[in-house]
Amino acid sequence: MLELLVSASLTVNSDRPGKLKPSRADADVWTLSDREGITTSARSVSQLFARPCPRVPPGQPPSAMAAYSQTQYSAGIQQATPYTAYPPPAQAYGIPSYSIKTEDSLNHSPGQSGFLSYGSSFSTPASGQSPYTYQMHGTAGIYQGANGLTNAAGFGTVHQDYPSYPGFPQSQYSQYYSSSYNPPYVPASSICPSPLSTSTYVLQEASHNIPSQSSESLGGEYNTHNGPSTPAKEGDTDRPPRASDGKLRGRSKRSSDPSPAGDNEIERVFVWDLDETIIIFHSLLTGTFASRYGKDTTASVRIGLMMEEMIFNLADTHLFFNDLEDCDQIHVDDVSSDDNGQDLSTYNFSADGFHSSAPGANLCLGSGVHGGVDWMRKLAFRYRRVKEMYNTYKNNVGGLIGAPKRETWLQLRAELEALTDLWLTHSLKALNLINSRPNCVNVLVTTTQLIPALAKVLLYGLGSVFPIENIYSATKTGKESCFERIMQRFGRKAVYIVIGDGVEEEQGAKKHNMPFWRISCHADLEALRHALELEYL
């Protein structure tokens, strides 16, 4: 009879848990005990009903309630012992350390949103190398303590600006680079109009970049290089001097190094042919250009002959072509190692006995090694003077040839542009685009002898885009050999693009896996300029 009453009472109370009251249950049980005389088992039944009750008696303080999002454990499950908290390793740049999700965290209460949640603001501003504060899953104490993570409320009240994060001084890394190190980053002012609040690297312009100078200021200097190559670092001064053609030279007695600095920092090298690519010259003399484009053949030949006369007149009068015709060099610095640095301001080239000291017609064999040390020094003097004249008058050839010839030259240039439909103008647009880039360079390889090639460059107004160090003559060795020297000079990391109209440069480019851009008409020049403007090349 007792068992039936107890089970009936359990059934009724389980169906209506909200109506369960401990005082009424106790009264029913004590009434039952009065009738049957059982008291001990009735107290255990009262405890059984009172244990799963979720309600809190009125007298119990609110602190006895479980904290929000705190893990609840059933009566039969023992709470797992918290794992030992280990401090995170030192973070080099303020990256927060992440804890591993443990097995007991899988039994989280439904009120917890996930493994990692964020608060309304950082409890304390991040300082030094400290990791940021996050609220981890399980706030009962498993992930607290030495791990540096604190409970924070959600984002949204205090906006943390990026400048509040600490900057990292670069002084601690001074042992890894010299004081002259210039990080190759773009200045912040050129990227956005408003100044950035964070610390940024600013590329400071090197003090030894040669600005645009007047032609008179470069008259007495030997080491004058206005090319687009990158300035050298201070640490490079102790290295062996490297000639501008890419070959290592022994130390001469000159105080200045003729080689342009920073050749191995060039990223892209444009190797140009001269005749029928940049300028129209040979096809004027033969009449090929006039017949192809329907021009006056007589006028074409006349203009070609007049330009040829001016070229050789300039070469003979100012560039020692009479002395150097049989001693032609591939590059202007090929004999610079024989120069002792003597002052040439009062040197008399016509009376130094250059011809008489070199017997026979074959003054030069190979690359010019003949005639003894004294004769080689006089040869080097002439090439040094040629270099000085080129650098002085490359933007003012009219001042070199004189006023009467200057007028003739200007008239001839105008007629040439009209006959060739502005061929040279289109070429100069592409050349100037390349020349304006900081890490790109124009290099000229021509089958003309070096001295007449320099005269052509000056008379056609190309001196500003071709430094004399970037001009090579392939008369003796061929263009493929010149390509190898150029690659040795600028390094294998640079990208080489060959631009020309002939088979020789195309085959040389193919052998060295260089892209080749053929120039055969005005449309090719326009397409090249368009590709450069869009930075496809």
UniProtKB/Swiss-Prot annotation:
Molecular function GO labels: histone H2AXY142 phosphatase activity; magnesium ion binding; protein tyrosine phosphatase activity
Recorded E.C. number(s)?
Answer: 3.1.3.48
Keyword annotations for this protein, in alphabetical order, are:
Activator, Chromatin regulator, Cytoplasm, Developmental protein, DNA damage, DNA repair, Hydrolase, Magnesium, Metal-binding, Nucleus, Protein phosphatase, Transcription, Transcription regulation
Biased composition (Polar residues) is annotated at: 210-229
Its localization reads: Cytoplasm; Nucleus
Q: Active-site positions, per UniProt?
A: D273 (nucleophile), D275 (proton donor)
GO CC field: cytoplasm; nucleus
Record Pfam families: Hydrolase (PF00702)
Q: Which CDD domains match?
A: HAD_Eya
Matches recorded under SUPFAM superfamilies: HAD-like
Q: Where is this region: Disordered?
A: 210-262
Name what cofactor the protein needs. Answer: Mg(2+)
In the UniProt record, does the keyword Cell membrane occur? no
Q: Which reaction does it catalyse?
A: O-phospho-L-tyrosyl-[protein] + H2O = L-tyrosyl-[protein] + phosphate
How many and how are cofactors bound here?
Binds 1 Mg(2+) ion per subunit.
Positions contributing to Mg(2+) binding: D273, D275, D501
Which segments show compositional bias classed as Basic and acidic residues? Answer: 233-248
Record flagged with keyword Transit peptide:
no
Q: What is the purpose of this protein? A: Functions both as protein phosphatase and as transcriptional coactivator for SIX1, and probably also for SIX2, SIX4 and SIX5. Tyrosine phosphatase that dephosphorylates 'Tyr-142' of histone H2AX (H2AXY142ph) and promotes efficient DNA repair via the recruitment of DNA repair complexes containing MDC1. 'Tyr-142' phosphorylation of histone H2AX plays a central role in DNA repair and acts as a mark that distinguishes between apoptotic and repair responses to genotoxic stress. Its function as histone phosphatase may contribute to its function in transcription regulation during organogenesis.
Q: How does it assemble?
A: Interacts with DACH2 and SIX1, and probably with SIX2, SIX4 and SIX5. Interacts with CAPN8. Interacts with GNAZ and GNAI2; this precludes interaction with SIX1.
UniProt cross-references to PANTHER family, sorted A to Z: EYES ABSENT, EYES ABSENT HOMOLOG 2
The UniProt similarity line reads: Belongs to the HAD-like hydrolase superfamily. EYA family.
Name listed for the protein in its UniProt record: Protein phosphatase EYA2
UniProt gene name: EYA2
